[in-house]
Amino acid sequence: GPSLPPAMAHSNVVPPPRHGRNAGVAFDPSWIEDCRINLSASERRVATLPGRRTVKKDAQAAWLLKAVTCMDLTTLAGDDTAGRVRRLCAKAMRPVRADLLESLGMGERGIRTGAVCVYHRFVATAVAALAGSGIPVAAISTGFPAGLVPHDVKLREIEESVSDGAAEIDIVITREHVLTGNWKALYDEMRDFRAACGQAHVKAILATGDIRTLRNVARAAMVCMMAGADFIKTSTGKEATNATLTVTLTMLRMIRDYHDRTGFKVGFKPAGGISAAKDILNYQILMKEELGRDWFEPDLFRIGASSLLADIERQLEHHVTGRYSASN
């Protein structure tokens, strides 16, 4: 594919992944035509998931701790403050109570979340709060959540977040390009976003609740990967419908297809409405079955979440003590 512009100097570089970064490929409409999705088969596959594969009790705690390390701990509220962001960063550095980690034999291991995700206004605050922790800051960008600001404003927003120290940028695509089948426009937009990010990794939010069909989800995913997305992400968390297992299966199969065609590994991030520990186990099972162990690590799997962490902590406490503390 065409080479990308040189990376910009960067203050908070992501640790290099265990695999090469997705460089993208030249736009090829035939790849989009090839995206075939069988809705009823996908729904059947997902419906049988909870009964077909259960994670054994002892393994559950390990899987949930792994989920914590893949979490983008997030606050995206209109009433966010610097104080709230600093508290979130403190939690990201120590997401699970020390006594629980000791009981699980993980006291030495220093568990932390995959990233902290905030609005651009709070990037510098989060970078300062996380200094020395190795936890990257992810900024949502490009006129999130609707993505309807002018293109040059989107690029400037990305560049400012990167210069403030964001190591990851979660962008939103223009849904109209998907709904009208204007795939070249989507590709060009995504290519520009990737270039503006420089060394920062880019997660493409497909807003799957807005683009309506699984076929659209599949095609939008493929176009964003062709244009160099490091991750594809289900949702902003602001749509009426957020992450679902059926949409997830569709996106995972596109990741696998793209990897088969190019050799590039692209990450996956479900987001929005994932608040129960038992739900995240289903996502993990699907990831493992569709893509394998490589997609269990934070360089290829992230979970967008705010309230999920509290439930995971409750489940870990139950695992250790046999009882639940009061849900606060």
PLM features: residue spans?
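Polar low-complexity intrinsically disordered regions enriched in Ser/Thr and small residues
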Residues: P2-L4, A23, S325
